[in-house]
């Protein structure tokens, strides 16, 4: 059997998935959906989760589910929980040191989005001591992985570079990989 069509990347649509930043995590089952599909489902009045058919959750229930999945070492849930602490979402107080700890755990579990968030917090000294060398090492490893976050990592490396020629090199690579 030979495939005549390209493999569908998204779980609900035929559009190829963009960078992971365009994915929406469904907390009820920790599955991701592309942002465009999530918006279309909302416009059409489909408020159930397209995967597990769960009813929409309140902020408290969503937080409880996130903590449940994070306790089971779901990398996406740990990263999302870190983002909630960083921004103060779901009724949480902003707690940057807790966000850093959660991002570090998500990085250990292999979440690329957490690498970007942790690297940015380290580079800015947000919730932790400023450590541009560690941030650059995180971004360098992510860039070499050539995943969907590689252009973001190259852009961040360009921002951290002290030499203008190195910065231009990283920004050129980011642009070549689709970062705009």
Regions found by a protein language model. Give the residues of each.
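Proximal pre-RING flanking segment of RING-type E3 ubiquitin ligases
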Residues: 1-25
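Short cysteine-rich clusters marking metal-coordination/redox-active sites
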Residues: 10-13, 25-26, 34, 49-52
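Short helix-capping/linker turns of helical repeat alpha-solenoids
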Residues: 30, 71-75, 87-89, 108-112, ...
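Canonical positions in the second alpha-helix
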Residues: 69, 105-106, 141-142, 173-174
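Hydrophobic face of amphipathic alpha-helices that form TPR/SEL1-like repeat modules
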Residues: 78-87, 92, 115-124, 154-162
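Cys/His-coordinated zinc-finger cores
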Residues: 28, 32-45
């Amino acid at each position: 059997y030979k495939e005549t069509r390209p493999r569908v990347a998204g779980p609900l649509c035929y559009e190829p998935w963009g960078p992971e930043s365009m994915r929406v995590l469904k907390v009820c089952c920790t599955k991701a959906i592309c942002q465009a599909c999530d918006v279309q489902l909302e416009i059409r009045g489909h408020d159930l989760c397209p995967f597990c058919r769960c009813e929409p959750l309140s902020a408290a229930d969503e937080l409880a589910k996130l903590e449940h999945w994070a306790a089971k070492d779901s990398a996406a849930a740990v990263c999302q929980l870190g983002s909630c602490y960083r921004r103060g979402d779901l009724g949480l107080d902003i707690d940057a040191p807790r966000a850093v700890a959660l991002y570090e755990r998500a990085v250990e579990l292999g979440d690329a989005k957490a690498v970007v968030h942790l690297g940015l917090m380290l580079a800015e000294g947000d919730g932790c001591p400023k450590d541009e060398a560690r941030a650059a090492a995180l971004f360098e490893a992510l860039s070499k992985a050539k995943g969907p976050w590689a252009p973001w990592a190259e852009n961040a490396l360009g921002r951290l570079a002290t030499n203008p020629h190195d910065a231009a090199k990283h920004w050129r690579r980011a642009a070549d990989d689709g970062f705009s």
